[in-house]
């Protein structure tokens, strides 16, 4: 997994400083990872902004409650199988993603069957990206 080939498109700003601190901690460990903030709006307007931000050659991974629930090791393996493809992880706002965006995704992924604030989902995703990289590199960070 190459962080410089990954982008996170997330609706909304991170308002809690402790979440922002966590995001920055892992972002420093994943050089090249890009985070695009999409302005909060109606689901249709958010979808328009997300579509406009997606690149034609990106493998779109939509985060949603009803997506595939996978453990950290299968997640790392899946990212490894994607090789050098450019990845766009999409995190919706309070109302989630539109059906059109869900359908456009190459993979629908769930971090948990529970619902989390989008800013916390962003932190959880970036930690899992770092963990996936550690798993693939054989780093002791992942001890499960």
UniProtKB/Swiss-Prot annotation:
Its main location: cytoplasm. S-adenosyl-L-methionine binds at residues 63, 92, 111-116. The keyword Transmembrane does not apply. It is an enzyme of class 2 (transferase). The keyword Metal-binding does not apply. Keywords: Cytoplasm, Methyltransferase, rRNA processing, S-adenosyl-L-methionine, Transferase. GO terms for molecular function: rRNA (pseudouridine-N3-)-methyltransferase activity. It is found in: Cytoplasm. Specifically methylates the pseudouridine at position 1915 (m3Psi1915) in 23S rRNA. Belongs to the RNA methyltransferase RlmH family. HAMAP family: 23SrRNA_methyltr_H. This is Ribosomal RNA large subunit methyltransferase H. It comes from Parasynechococcus marenigrum (strain WH8102).
């Amino acid at each position: 997994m190459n962080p410089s080939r990954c982008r996170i498109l997330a609706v909304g700003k991170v308002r809690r400083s402790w979440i922002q601190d966590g995001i920055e901690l892992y972002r420093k460990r994943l050089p090249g990872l890009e985070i695009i903030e999409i302005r909060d709006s109606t689901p249709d307007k958010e979808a328009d902004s997300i579509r406009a931000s997606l690149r034609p050659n990106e493998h779109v991974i939509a985060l949603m409650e009803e997506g595939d629930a996978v453990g950290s090791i299968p997640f790392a393996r899946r990212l490894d199988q994607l090789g050098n493809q450019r990845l766009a992880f999409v995190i919706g706002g309070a109302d989630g993603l539109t059906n059109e965006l869900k359908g456009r995704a190459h993979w629908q992924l769930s971090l948990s069957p529970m619902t989390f604030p989008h800013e916390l989902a962003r932190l959880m995703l970036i930690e899992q990206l770092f963990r996936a990289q550690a798993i693939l590199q054989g780093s002791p960070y992942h001890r499960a």
